[in-house]
A protein has these predicted regions:
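Extended, charged helical/alpha-beta scaffold domains that provide interaction surfaces
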Residues: 1-168
Length: 168
């Protein structure tokens, strides 16, 4: 499932950015981890507890992945029909791609127009353009993933309100 892979990617990225392999569990950067993860996946904030003593980075990553998947499965259970949530996933993903892609095209145009200034800095404009374009593309892909997962976790089903007919 695409959304499940995206969730795993987000957890891996957040843990990879915030947690060092060679640091003890009680000294991990929990604030940074929460700042990266919680705006996208609404888990409980991660804090050090005694049962985490001796925990490895991979263990934390696995624990957070399991919690995030469990939370998403609970969100799926809110939908009466599984096909409806799959359709919603497709629509949300397409909208995120469309939005990020149009922004990316605009950003690439601005990069193309401004890249000539790199020659003044004694740098090869073509090399700088390729490096910047790659970074921007990577940022776009990450943004698509984050937007899609954030929206899917925060989506709610609205039940149609049944009204009694007004007596004439």
């Amino acid at each position: 499932d695409t959304i499940m892979r995206m969730i795993n990617d987000i957890v891996e990225h957040a843990v990879g950015m915030a947690i060092s392999e060679d640091v003890d569990a009680k000294d991990w950067a929990y604030t940074e981890l929460n700042e990266l993860l919680l705006p996208i996946i609404p888990l409980q904030p991660v804090r050090y507890t005694e049962d985490m003593k001796g925990m490895k980075k991979a263990d934390l990553m696995q624990k957070l992945k399991e919690e995030a998947i469990k939370l998403y499965e609970a969100k799926e259970a809110e939908f009466p029909d599984l096909e409806k949530i799959r359709e919603l996933e497709r629509v949300v993903l397409l909208k995120a791609i469309d939005n990020r892609w149009t922004n990316h095209i605009d950003d690439m145009e601005q990069l193309r127009q401004g890249i000539g200034l790199q020659a003044y800095g004694q740098r090869d404009p073509l090399v700088e353009y390729k490096m910047s374009a790659y970074d921007m593309f990577d940022e776009m892909i990450t943004g698509i993933t984050e937007d899609t997962v954030r929206i899917m976790y925060h989506v709610r089903i609205e039940q149609p309100v049944e009204r009694e007919p007004v007596v004439k």
